Design a protein with these regions (language model features):
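Acceptor-substrate binding/catalytic loop of class I
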Residues: 84, 101-121
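Residue-level recognition of beta-strand->loop/alpha-helix junctions
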Residues: 12, 137-138
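Short low-complexity, flexible loop/linker segments enriched in glycine and/or proline
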Residues: 24-30, 97-98, 148-152
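Core SAM-dependent methyltransferase catalytic element
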Residues: 146-165
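Short alpha-helix
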Residues: 113-136
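Short, flexible, mixed-charge acidic loops at enzyme active sites
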Residues: 91-101
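Conserved SAM-binding loop
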Residues: 1-91, 119-122, 160-164
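A short, acidic/glycine-rich surface segment
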Residues: 19, 143-148
């Protein structure tokens, strides 16, 4: 987004992640404002046009408060994307057993299945936070090409696009 001319602010609750992101931005000559915080703790008078919550909501303690906080940071008619894991047996097998224990792509304990969220639950909570669903797609990872693509299958990963009203 920065390369396309957008004014970008990136936040993360982890100082380590912010440090890595800053190094990446510097290496790629990107002007990104990074802040070590979370939506729940962020005090900003500035409202954002777009919020990307990519693979984060399945790690937060209070989904209601998280989405309320994100909504409060989003401009009216702003867009928020949420990419996350569905709460299914298949997602447990692939995202936890497969990715953490078998493939070792992620440290064991990265995910807690109890925090995974079904699309309909995400949509219901978001509606209460003035966020209306615009689009919902599944996402699939292709091991051979090492790439993600959109899919009608939402049983493991999915991405939702919301608009603030």
């Amino acid at each position: 987004m920065c390369r396309l001319g957008a004014d970008v602010t990136g936040i993360d609750a982890s100082e380590k992640n912010i440090s890595i992101a800053k190094l990446h931005a510097k290496k790629n000559k990107l002007n990104i404002n990074y802040i070590c915080t979370s939506p729940e703790k962020m005090k900003s008078k500035k409202k954002f046009d777009v919020i990307l919550n990519m693979e984060i909501i399945e790690h937060v303690e209070d989904v209601n408060f998280f989405l309320e906080s994100c909504s409060s940071l989003l401009k009216k008619d702003g867009i928020m994307f949420v990419a996350t894991l569905n709460k299914t047996l298949k997602s447990y097998v692939f995202a936890i057993v497969g990715a953490e224990y078998i493939m070792r792509w992620l440290p064991i304990g990265t995910h807690e299945w109890e925090k995974f969220i079904k699309p309909e639950d995400l949509i219901n909570i978001s509606n209460k936070k003035k966020l209306k669903l615009k689009k919902l797609d599944g996402m699939k990872f292709n091991l051979l090409t090492d790439k993600w693509k959109l899919s009608p299958d939402k049983s493991i990963n999915y991405i939702a696009q919301f608009v603030k009203y």
